[in-house]
């Protein structure tokens, strides 16, 4: 792990003291996707959590989220072999990190490169090699309480630039509120790609659902620390290690007969 505490990069103006995240204060009624007016109303009522709140990031039917500071590299062991994602030890070996994004200036000096145009020298960046995949996170803590669910989609600009942001895991169950983990993959075969920290990289879409029985943590919540915690506690207790997959927590079941 890089030197320093996992919370070294926590540029949130303050730790908000808010009520318990369950049950919701109010529930938006309707069908389908939340519109921007419904999103704003749900944020105001406490049914949707979006912190830090930036109104300009609320689009017509989604909320833009930005790239956070921490990341894990994958497949750092180039000797090949087998990876068992259901073994906690294998998971720890497979993922390299967590790493903290370096400033543009420091990265350029370390790699004997000139500064890239447009990107400020003091901007933290993550540089992906051709074909490289990393685990990264949103800077924002975001999600919706039950009833309701959400998905994360890459912003189209990144897709057009050959970068997959949510490779295959962009679903947020009812009640999941946290920083979201992103599987970012550079699909370019010959070009490195620069990812500035703080850049809008994905968008969260919220959906209406019917009543939900049970809480996220009890139903499927391997990645939520405490559904009853307030937002301030989530922010204070967040660690980069929460990005790592936890398939080893699933119960193994015998194959059902045909």
Give, region by region, the residue ranges found by the protein language model.
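DUTPase catalytic domain/fold
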Residues: 2-258
């Amino acid at each position: 792990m890089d030197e320093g505490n996992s919370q070294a990069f926590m540029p949130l103006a303050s730790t908000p003291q808010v009520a318990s995240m369950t049950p919701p204060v109010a529930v938006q009624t309707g069908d389908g996707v939340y519109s921007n007016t419904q999103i704003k109303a749900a944020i105001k009522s406490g049914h949707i959590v979006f912190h830090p709140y930036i109104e300009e990031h609320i689009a017509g039917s989604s909320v833009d989220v930005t790239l956070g500071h921490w990341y894990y590299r994958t497949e750092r062991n180039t000797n090949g072999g087998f990876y068992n994602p259901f073994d906690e030890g294998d998971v720890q070996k497979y993922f390299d990190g967590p790493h903290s994004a370096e400033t543009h200036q420091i990265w350029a000096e370390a790699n004997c490169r000139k500064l890239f145009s447009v990107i400020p020298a003091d901007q933290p960046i993550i540089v992906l090699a051709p074909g490289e995949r990393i685990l990264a996170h949103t800077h924002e803590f975001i999600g919706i309480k039950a009833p309701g669910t959400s998905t994360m989609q890459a912003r189209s600009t990144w897709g057009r630039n050959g970068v997959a942001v949510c490779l295959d895991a962009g679903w947020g169950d009812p009640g999941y509120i946290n920083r979201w983990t992103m599987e970012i993959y550079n699909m370019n075969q010959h070009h490195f790609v620069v990812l500035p920290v703080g850049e809008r990289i994905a968008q969260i879409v919220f959906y209406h659902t019917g009543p939900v029985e049970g809480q996220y943590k009890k139903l499927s919540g391997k990645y939520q620390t405490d559904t009853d915690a307030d937002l301030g506690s989530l922010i204070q207790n967040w660690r980069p290690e929460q990005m790592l997959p936890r398939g080893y927590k699933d119960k193994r079941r015998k194959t059902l007969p045909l």
